[in-house]
A protein has these predicted regions:
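A cross-family signal for N-terminal binding/gating loops and helix N-caps
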Residues: 1-238
Length: 238
């Protein structure tokens, strides 16, 4: 099959009403691309993606650990923790009316969940520079590629994702669980409440309960049918 970036972009355009099985199938196809065909290219170097995690929310897959965003497919996204995501096509209603604080208008951004909401991205956890095999381990190390961009013009040398299987040796990948998915909360209910309070307009009690139940089901499935994270087998998964 002739692999190309447009096919990957189509795979990254998961709809608001896609079923869970369709989402899992898309994850699997996208993972095959990232493991075996894609590299990140800068002006002077190429980098292989060695560890990545899937995050996606829609009405049939309510993974509320996913950061809300609005984006076309295949855009880079600096997430709330300073790491780099590769975005799915994402659409969610946003209220960015300024807040008045101490007499000044300040920027505020609150997202509104609905049956039409769909958003997400792929967190890049580890990459390897192909020229010397140096590994950048952890989302903040990966973000070093995006640290310094020219402030004087818009034609910047931003890293891009390209199809380049000839640069990649064959590697075996494992599928561990996503790293530290609940963060410091260690509890699904607390994690859901934290994300809702941090990013979203208030939801009613029944919606909150649905989000808690949905996340529990996702994490239960992830523990047995691991298809949310892929890392090369030489990495000791954290």
């Amino acid at each position: 099959m002739n692999r190309n970036i447009d096919e990957l972009r189509t795979l990254m355009s998961i709809s608001a009403n896609a079923s869970e099985s369709e989402i899992m199938e898309a994850f699997d196809s996208i993972a095959n691309y990232l493991k075996n065909y894609c590299v990140i290219k800068t002006k002077d170097e190429k980098y292989r993606i060695l560890d990545f995690e899937f995050y996606f929310f829609n009405q049939n897959h309510q993974d509320i650990t996913t950061h809300p965003r609005n984006s076309e497919a295949l855009c880079w996204y600096i997430n709330d923790f300073g790491g780099i995501d590769l975005n799915f096509e994402s659409k969610v209603e946003v209220n960015n009316e300024p807040m008045v604080k101490k007499g000044f208008k300040t920027y505020s951004c609150r997202y509104k969940l609905s049956s039409d909401s769909y958003f997400g991205g792929i967190l890049i956890r580890q990459i390897q520079r192909l020229s010397d095999k140096v590994i950048f381990d952890g989302p903040l190390k990966v973000a070093e590629l995006f640290r310094t961009l020219n402030a004087s013009h818009q034609l910047q040398d931003i890293p891009i994702l390209i199809i380049d299987p000839e640069s990649l040796e064959k590697l075996e990948f494992a599928s561990p669980q996503r790293h530290n998915i609940l963060g410091s909360h260690k509890d699904i209910t607390k994690k859901v409440d934290y994300n809702l309070q941090s990013c979203f307009e208030k939801v009613d009690d029944s919606e909150r309960a649905d989000l808690i139940n949905s996340l529990q089901k996702i994490l239960d499935k992830e523990s047995t049918n691991r298809c949310y994270r892929y890392c090369w087998a030489g990495l000791k998964a954290k």
